């Protein structure tokens, strides 16, 4: 299976309120420190493997403004891929809900392939990429 990244679309993700990045056969990402380069790599890994660019599990990806998380909207990473010549859109979205007294919260992840809701198991199985192999 040949997989090529065509685009990443980010919503409320780390330092990005909304941003789209197009990828080509060769794409260079360059910027000053702290401007979001690692966030782009984390968006890819978080969507597919629930880890950051350093392969640490379950990273905090919700955008913050003034040191406070933006909770009133979902956080998402959408990958537009070319899989064996066919365009495939894979999306992971995270919704935050608070307890009634506001003392705790829960982040629920939802997964989509070509806008069709999927279970985590089906989402992970779609590309057949093993995270342990990816880490090598």
Specify the residue positions occupied by each region the protein language model found.
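Pre-Walker A-like glycine/lysine-rich segment at the N-terminus of P-loop NTPase domains
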Residues: 1-45
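Short solvent-exposed loop/turn micro-motifs enriched in small/polar/acidic residues
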Residues: 13, 71-74, 103-104
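Extended, charged alpha-helical "arm/stalk" segments used for dimerization and assembly
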Residues: 27, 87-136
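Conserved P-loop NTP-binding catalytic core
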Residues: 30-31, 41-99, 109
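Polar low-complexity intrinsically disordered regions enriched in Ser/Thr and small residues
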Residues: 37, 69-70, 131
């Amino acid at each position: 299976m040949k997989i090529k990244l065509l685009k990443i679309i980010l919503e409320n993700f780390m330092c990005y309120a909304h941003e789209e990045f197009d990828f080509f056969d060769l794409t260079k990402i360059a910027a000053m420190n702290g401007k979001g380069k690692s966030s782009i790599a984390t968006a890819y890994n978080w969507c597919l493997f629930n880890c950051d660019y350093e392969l640490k599990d379950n990273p905090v990806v919700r955008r913050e403004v003034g040191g406070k998380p933006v909770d009133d909207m979902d956080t998402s990473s959408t990958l537009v891929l070319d899989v064996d010549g066919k365009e495939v859109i894979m999306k992971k979205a995270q919704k935050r809900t608070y307890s009634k007294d506001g003392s705790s919260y829960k982040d629920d992840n939802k997964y989509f392939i070509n806008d069709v809701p999927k279970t985590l198991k089906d989402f992970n199985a779609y590309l057949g990429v093993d995270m342990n192999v990816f880490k090598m």
